[in-house]
């Protein structure tokens, strides 16, 4: 991660790294790969990822999306450093929980949410299945989907229980890692789910 963000050209740096496995083989999450999506979207749309996020999510959900870090070429970070409030992040989780619907509008193509939740690989760190930007973790007998950020930031969506959970944590290094993530899941399963069911 360090050599990548300290390079002069993040996209070039990612594209010139060797594969960790053959295509279709072992998956190793890479923030650099997520950044490539931001670069491709910026290039194809002719607009910044920030502008698109504000138009496609910020305006319809009535959330504030502040500017975040960019690479040396001016492309907004595709893998991290967004600074959403917990309430605004919960609105994005609710949008996914409702399959991309906001009232009677679809903000995403109809099958996008289900497609994004299909297992495409497994985390080398947690062994959790991974789709398009979402990991899977069942809790209390129901499948849930989560995105996690540095330092223990967590968005967890459980459609069957009509539940969206946002957890924020101290992002001061070092990152607490997978053991902390498991404690967050335990908190959801043992305390939050029973609280909303009662």
For each predicted feature, which ranges?
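Active-site Gly/Thr loop motif
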Residues: 8, 63-66, 113-166
């Amino acid at each position: 991660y360090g050599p990548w963000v300290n390079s002069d050209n993040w996209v070039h740096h990612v594209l010139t790294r060797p594969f960790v496995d053959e295509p279709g083989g072992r998956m190793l999450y890479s923030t650099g790969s997520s950044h490539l999506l931001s670069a491709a979207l910026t290039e194809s749309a002719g607009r910044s990822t920030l502008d698109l996020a504000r138009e496609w999510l910020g305006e319809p959900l009535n959330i504030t999306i502040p500017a975040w870090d960019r690479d040396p070429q001016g492309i907004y970070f595709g893998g991290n450093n967004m600074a959403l409030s917990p309430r605004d992040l919960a609105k994005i989780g609710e949008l996914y929980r409702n399959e991309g619907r906001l009232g009677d509008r679809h903000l995403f193509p109809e099958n996008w949410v289900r497609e994004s939740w299909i297992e495409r690989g497994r985390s080398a760190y947690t062994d959790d299945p991974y789709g398009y930007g979402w990991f899977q973790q069942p809790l209390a007998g129901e499948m849930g989907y989560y995105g996690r950020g540095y330092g223990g930031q967590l968005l967890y969506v459980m459609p069957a229980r009509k539940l969206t959970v946002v957890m924020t944590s101290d992002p001061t290094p070092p990152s607490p890692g997978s053991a902390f993530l498991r404690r967050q899941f335990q908190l959801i399963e043992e305390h939050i789910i029973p609280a909303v069911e009662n």
